[in-house]
Amino acid sequence: MNVKIQDLKDVTISGVKTLCTKSLDPYKETFFEWTAFPMTVDFKSTQIACGLLEGWHHTPAFDEIEYHADAELFYFLEGPAVMLFVDIKDGKAVMDSAQMVRIPAGTELSIDAGKGHFVAVA
């Protein structure tokens, strides 16, 4: 199946909220600059884990999809990255809903529980 890669600014993704942090004014002092990630998300769990994904340029391949019982946040510090989004019904991907989206650096994403997604660092 071929899916056209589209820029985030040109699409709407059901179940995904986006924010470009580059549009926010950072707080500045003499020796640092701080930019908030102001998107808030209601999680089902109070046990929240965070991590940093670092990748290297390659030809992206999408042979899996993931989804979760809780919401998920992504912060793209560098970019671009290519992400696959797809609706899930009865535990299976609804391929007619597939979207390939180019995510620029400085983007914050909130992905609803149950929304299929996968990031390929490209």
Model-derived features with residue positions:
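Histidine-centered metal-chelating micro-motifs
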Residues: T107-F118
